[in-house]
Each structure stands twice: as C-alpha cells, then as structure tokens.
Amino acid sequence: MSKIVILGAGESGAGAAVLAKKEGFEVFVSDMSKIKDNYKKLMDDHNIEWEEGHHTEEKILDADEVIKSPGIPKEAPMIQKLMAKGTPIISEIEFAGRYTDAKMICITGSNGKTTTTSLIYHIIKSAGYDVGLAGNIGKSLALQVAETPHKYYVIELSSFQLDNMYKFRANVAILRNITPDHLDRYEFKMQNYTDAKMRITQNQTEEDSFIFWNDDPIVTKELAKYNLKSHLCPFSEFKEEGCVGFIEDGKYKLNFPSDFEMPQADMSLRGKHNIYNSLAAGLACNIVGIDHETLHKGLSDFPGVEHRLEKVGKFQGVYYVNDSKATNVDACWYALESMTTPTILIIGGKDKGNDYNQIKDLVKEKCAGIVYLGADNQKLHDNFDALGIPVRDTHSMKDCVAACQELAKPGDTVLLSPCCASFDLFKNMEDRGEQFKALARAIGE
C-alpha cells in the first residue's frame, strides 16, 4: 500500500486525506498549527491518522508522495528535506484531478479571480448543470471528487496551487492578468511568479481553450514563448484584431464559439475591471455551451462577491465600501479607478514587495484622506506622506474607522482597499472585511 502524507490540514488538506483514504492509500496528516475541530472530525470519521503542533519527521520522510498545502512555502525545513530526498510533492488539485473525468474550468490571475470564478459558477449553476465550486473558494476539490462528484468544476487557482501541479489539465483555462503579487514567495523575481501563473496552460490540447486579457503586456509577451495547442480566446475592453470578447457600441459581445451580444447596461457588475471579469466569464460559459438566454440572465443578475467592492452602506452621510480582497496594488488601482466621490482610502497590512508608484496618481486625484492600517506603516509613510493629503496612522480596525469618521465629509466614500495581506493584524482577509463592516454599521446605529 502506497503511503501518502498530507502537510497542512485545512480545507484542501483534509479533503485530500479523505480522497486518498477512499482510493486505498495509507494516509498520514501533519500540521504544524492547530487543526480546526471540523477538520479533525472529518478525518476521524474516515479513520485518518493526524497530528497537530509538530511534524513527526520519520513518518513524513517515509512517504511515497506528499500533498502540500498551498500556504506552505518551499523554503519550509520539512519541504526542503523532502525535496532533498526526491519525494514527489503535489497539490490537492493535482491529486484530485487523477480521480475524475469532469470538465475543469480553471481561473487564475493577480486580480479578478474570485469574481470571475463566482460569476462562471453562478451562470453554469443557473443553467442546471451538475457543477462544483473549488480551489480558493468553495469546498475542497478532492473532497467533492470523493463524496459528491460533479460533471463540471469551476476552480479558482492561486500561483501557490499551480506551483505543485504537473499533469492536471484545464479544459478551459482563464488567465485574467499578471501584475506583481506574492513576490515574497518567488525570491522577489517577477519572472518566477509569471512562470507559476502560466502553468494553467500546461497539458492543454486542441480540444481545450485558453482565455486571456489581450492588453496585458506580460501575458502577450509570455505567449510568444509557448507553443500552445489550445484555442486562444483573447478579450479586451474594446474591439481589437483577433479578440473574441469585447465591448462595442454599448454592447457586450462574444464571437467564440458562437456569437452573443447584450446591452452593456444590462450587466450587473460595474467598473472597468468588471468588464474584463464579465468578458472572461462569458467566454468560458459560451465555450461550455450555456444557452444564450441563461448567459444573458446570469450576467444580469449576479449579486457580486463579498469583500470585493462590497457596498456596506451609507452612515452619517458617508458611503462605506469593503474591498478587503484587494491584497495587491493592482486591485487597489481598479477600486480607486471606480470611485466617483472624494475617497478616504484605508491601506496597509503585510506588504508583499509592493510598488506603490502605480497608484500614486490615482490617490492624488481621488483621495481626500488616507488611513494607514498595519502593524508597521513605515513604508506607507515613505510613499504617501509627501502627497499633501491628510494621513492617519492606525494599528487596529476600531482606530482606523474612527480616523475615517474624522476625515470624511458627507458625500465622501470610505474605501477599504488595503493593497496588502491581512495576517499582521487579522486572522485573514475575511476577518479584516467583517470587522470593517461591523464597525461601519455601528456608526448608523
């Protein structure tokens, strides 16, 4: 019996453990942190051996194959030992892909992943297809393959997940864009991060499709290096030669594999960045074969994604918008670009090698104030203090929202769009967004 060790017992690790057990492997799960009770119960229910708070090196190094949580960097000591030994290390997605013939619609990119993924799932589900949502959002792909298999999966993939995928094949691959992000995990080398994102195209055949933003200079440059066999499906904001998705004369248009159009005004998502998300999603659904009536309806009634330009409400005359998912500078740029009122920008957190020059002009144009929110705000002071905009320095969400109240005038918008990861002060991005929403709503009580 082959031995599989799973490092990390979160959503992906626990799910992979269940599938490995079902497929007859000897399974051992190890997590350096404390494992959540629901994942302990899931593993106990399937008689899976696990440990928390430490790694039993002897057991781990005895594995025939290791499934690694995407949150564990390759520099981790245990990963280094496994690599030195030559033990294969894969991702949960790679493992799950071995045990299903379902059609895989996979989405990656520095920005827009979650919105595009959620929109595709919304449309395909509305069409009555047997579809699962997996990857960065939804349930573990491996757990679904083991217990509730579907004919289609819509999967949001981070660069960390793609790093350990080798034979997995995306039937429809979407690359929304590539901008600097997570460079701390890629030796601060942009090419390393780019190579990870481009892995979404690996193993594609003539039967598959690759959807990408035609105006992304990095993607178009990279494409010249790859001899892709899949159908190339570029999209752009306006009609360009070769593009099969675009906006023209106030209409949203798709030209592959069938012609589709609808009034742009009918689209539920607003803002330039959401034009790109909607074009990518529409092309994927058109390729899958969704009927045009359902496609039109899905693009029209999609409710949006929590923590992504989420309107919290208007309190004491000030609008509050939660964009906690904006964990890089590019995402913040799109958020600021969509603002139509004077904006108090909340920015800060765990910096991932950010270059803030990209947003300085927009900050000067749109912002009436900036509130820094992080354990260490020095880099923000160095970048923004000289712009001549009022700034405040805070280290908790409570103090941050209080500072926003002080700076904002009726009619202004307070925008949480941090450019950074959340782990310095919060459990995760969702915790940051929930705290912001709760404190904003308390203003109106």
What function would you assign to each model-found segment?
Residues A20, V66, I107, N136, ...:
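Residue-level signal for inorganic ion chemistry
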Residues S2, K21-K22, E58-L61, P70-N214, ...:
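Phosphate-binding loop of NTP-binding sites
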Residues Y39-K41, N357-D412:
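C-terminal helical cap/extension that packs against the catalytic core
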Residues E26-M32, F210-N214, I346-I347, K366-A375:
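Short internal beta-strands
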Residues E11, P73, N111-T115, I275, ...:
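Residue-level detector of alpha-helix initiation sites
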Residues E51-H54, I90-E94, N227-I247, H296-S300, ...:
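Beta-strand->loop->alpha-helix junctions that form or flank phosphate-binding loops
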Residues K3, G15-E23, D130, M262-A368:
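Nucleotide phosphate-binding/pyrophosphate-handling subdomain across enzymes
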Residues M1-S91, F95, R270, D382, ...:
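N-terminal leader/targeting and accessory segments in enzymes
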